[in-house]
């Protein structure tokens, strides 16, 4: 069984190595206008709230989660 497994895996990965990998052609231009302080503050605040609010909720209720489990 163990002798056959590497041969099977080598057979599966051998055909995958020959497949062409598509490459993305992404071209961008510089922004037309710079972002202001208010726009940066709103974007930064929304990102921080999105990531930190759920983590804070979980951390503040960790003891109740431990008691339930």
Swiss-Prot record:
The keyword NAD does not apply. Residues 61-69 are mitochondrial intermembrane. In response to mitochondrial stress, the precursor protein is ubiquitinated by the SIFI complex in the cytoplasm before mitochondrial import, leading to its degradation. Within the SIFI complex, UBR4 initiates ubiquitin chain that are further elongated or branched by KCMF1. InterPro entries: Cyt_c_oxidase_su8 (IPR003205), Cyt_c_oxidase_su8_sf (IPR036548). The chain crosses the membrane at residues 37-60. Its main location: mitochondrion. Belongs to the cytochrome c oxidase VIII family. Component of the cytochrome c oxidase, the last enzyme in the mitochondrial electron transport chain which drives oxidative phosphorylation. The respiratory chain contains 3 multisubunit complexes succinate dehydrogenase (complex II, CII), ubiquinol-cytochrome c oxidoreductase (cytochrome b-c1 complex, complex III, CIII) and cytochrome c oxidase (complex IV, CIV), that cooperate to transfer electrons derived from NADH and succinate to molecular oxygen, creating an electrochemical gradient over the inner membrane that drives transmembrane transport and the ATP synthase. This is Cytochrome c oxidase subunit 8A, mitochondrial. The lineage of its organism: Eukaryota, Metazoa, Chordata, Craniata, Vertebrata.
């Amino acid at each position: 069984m163990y002798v056959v497994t590497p041969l099977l895996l080598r057979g599966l990965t051998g055909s995958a190595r020959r497949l062409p990998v598509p490459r993305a052609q992404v071209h961008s231009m510089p922004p037309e206008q710079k972002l202001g302080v208010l726009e940066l503050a709103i974007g930064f605040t929304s990102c921080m709230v999105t990531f930190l609010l759920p983590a804070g909720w979980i951390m503040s209720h960790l003891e109740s989660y431990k008691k339930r489990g």
